[in-house]
A protein has these predicted regions:
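A short, hydrophobic beta-strand/beta-hairpin element that forms part of a small beta-sheet core
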Residues: 65-77
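Conserved helix-turn-beta segment immediately C-terminal to the redox Cys motif
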Residues: 33-44
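Thioredoxin-like thiol-disulfide oxidoreductase module
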Residues: 48-64, 95
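Residues at or immediately flanking beta-strands
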Residues: 12, 42-47
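Ser/Thr/Gly-rich flexible loops in soluble cytosolic domains mediating phosphotransfer, phosphorylation
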Residues: 83-96
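Local sequence-structure signature of Cys/Sec-based thiol-disulfide redox active-site neighborhoods
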Residues: 6-35
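Short beta-strand/turn micro-motifs at beta-sheet edges
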Residues: 1-4
Length: 96
């Protein structure tokens, strides 16, 4: 299970990307937009470049990028892809 540092945020997310690949850039922009719009002032978004930190990605079980992990609240949830389908991303993140 991914390690999570203590946070005051209601929702803690970690986005794994692969450098400046087009889908990674889209996922970063989409994740930031979703967080700012739907979870303002109550989220923590960490972006991890799998090319720079492959062992961390491996430890979290990441084999495909982009992958967004919702670390808190538990249970951990995953969304794979560029996060362009906001409704589906929100359904997964909110556990519905």
């Amino acid at each position: 299970m991914p390690k999570v540092k203590r946070s005051n945020a209601d929702i803690v997310l970690r986005l794994y990307v692969a450098g400046s690949a087009p889908n990674s850039l889209s996922a970063m922009a989409n994740a930031k937009g979703i967080c700012d719009t739907h979870f303002p002032a109550r989220h923590k978004l960490e972006i991890v470049d799998m090319l720079q930190d492959p062992m961390r990605a491996l430890a979290d079980g990441i084999i495909v990028t982009p992958t967004l992990l919702r670390l808190l609240p538990l249970p951990v949830r995953r969304v794979i892809g560029n996060l362009s389908d906001t409704a589906q991303v929100l359904l997964t993140l909110e556990g519905k």
